[in-house]
């Protein structure tokens, strides 16, 4: 009889644990929306931010440190005001971080160092390519022709299109 009552006590304790855990997670958000993208609330702040195009893991850690947030804390555990502060900081293009950490340094029109995210980054990259094409720079011409831009080999690699096989010299 003693064993049966001990088992009942254990099962009662185990049953109480999940209920307590659910009570702790009342404010937990499983999806957090930042910069028009849904982020997984179960991931730590830097990892969740790295899901945004234009923010890597290192920048995610830097943003968490700048806003005095624990990098190990899950993004879904943040309070509403902390999430708003994070949204505002990420969507702001001018970060108060070192220049080498940003993805669009010395912007041609204003000369400022920016970090662009999501569609802003896509649009800016396309504008930069169009500017190179317009001014007929070497990189712009390579972009127009669909060739490799960054100095890679083209003789034996990256073949696509109509050519079939290797062209041999006639003897």
Curated annotation (Swiss-Prot):
Highest taxon listed in the record's lineage: Archaea
Disordered, as annotated region: 1-22, 142-171
Database matches in InterPro entries: Rbsml_uS13_C, Ribosomal_uS13, Ribosomal_uS13-like_H2TH, Ribosomal_uS13_archaeal, Ribosomal_uS13_CS
Biological process per Gene Ontology, one example term: translation
Basic residues: compositionally biased ranges: 142-158
Biased composition (Basic and acidic residues): 10-22
GO CC term (a single one): cytosol
Molecular functions per Gene Ontology: rRNA binding; structural constituent of ribosome
Entry keyword set: Ribonucleoprotein, Ribosomal protein, RNA-binding, rRNA-binding
A Pfam match: Ribosomal_S13
SUPFAM superfamilies: S13-like H2TH domain
Complex formation: Part of the 30S ribosomal subunit. Forms a loose heterodimer with protein S19. Forms two bridges to the 50S subunit in the 70S ribosome.
Family in the record: Belongs to the universal ribosomal protein uS13 family.
Function description: Located at the top of the head of the 30S subunit, it contacts several helices of the 16S rRNA. In the 70S ribosome it contacts the 23S rRNA (bridge B1a) and protein L5 of the 50S subunit (bridge B1b), connecting the 2 subunits; these bridges are implicated in subunit movement.
Protein name: Small ribosomal subunit protein uS13
Gene: rps13
């Amino acid at each position: 009889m003693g064993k049966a009552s001990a088992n009942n006590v254990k099962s009662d304790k185990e049953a109480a644990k999940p209920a307590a855990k659910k009570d702790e997670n009342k404010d937990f958000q499983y999806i957090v929306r930042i910069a028009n993208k849904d982020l997984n609330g179960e991931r730590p702040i830097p990892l969740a931010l790295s899901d945004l195009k234009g923010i890597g893991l290192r920048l995610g850690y830097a943003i968490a440190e700048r806003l005095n947030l624990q990098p190990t804390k899950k993004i879904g555990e943040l309070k509403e005001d902390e999430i708003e502060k994070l949204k505002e900081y990420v969507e702001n293009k001018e970060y108060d971080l070192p220049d080498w950490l940003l993805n669009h340094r010395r912007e041609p029109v204003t000369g400022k160092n920016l970090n662009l995210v999501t569609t802003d980054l896509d649009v800016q990259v396309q504008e930069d390519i169009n500017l190179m094409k317009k001014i007929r720079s070497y990189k712009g011409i390579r972009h127009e022709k669909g060739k490799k831009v960054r100095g890679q080999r083209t003789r034996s690699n990256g073949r696509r299109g109509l050519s079939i096989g290797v062209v041999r010299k006639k003897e």
